[in-house]
UniProtKB/Swiss-Prot annotation:
Monomer. Pfam families: Cytochrom_C_2 (PF01322). This is Cytochrome c-556. SUPFAM superfamilies: Cytochromes (SSF47175). It comes from Agrobacterium tumefaciens (strain B2A). It comes from the Bacteria.
Length: 122
């Protein structure tokens, strides 16, 4: 797969992981520590690898905003923050639904902050 497809796949994996966490935090699915750990691990791993998925020459053909390449250091910092916050959640793995909801607020805010600036509106 090309770079665009690869990074879109990584984003979809994060979206799926966030969906799993959301279902637990809302009580739609029962709390399961293994599910939470796997979801947060996916988020952290993918976030840390994001900056390498946006090489020069891949600025078109996706929802990636030109601002990524114009402000690459800030983009990298935002990806790193998501990775670090995921590591913090993993180190203090939530033990119940409320803990997952708290973790979701932090991770979701990281996603939103980056998407607001660096994802084109559909």
């Amino acid at each position: 797969a090309g770079e665009v497809e690869k990074r879109e796949g990584m984003m979809k994996q994060i979206g799926g992981a966030m969906g799993s966490l959301a279902a637990i935090s809302k009580g739609e699915k029962p709390f399961d520590a293994d599910t939470v750990k796997a979801a947060v691990t996916t988020i952290g791993t993918n976030a840390k690898a994001f900056p390498e998925q946006f090489p020069a020459g891949t600025e078109t053909g996706s929802a990636a905003a030109p601002a990524i390449w114009e402000n690459f250091e800030d983009f990298k910092a935002k990806a790193a923050k998501l990775g670090t916050d995921a590591d913090i959640v993993l180190a203090n793995l939530p033990g119940d639904q409320a803990g997952v909801a708290t973790a979701m607020k932090t991770l979701g805010a990281d996603c939103g902050t980056c998407h607001q600036t660096y994802r084109l509106k559909k």
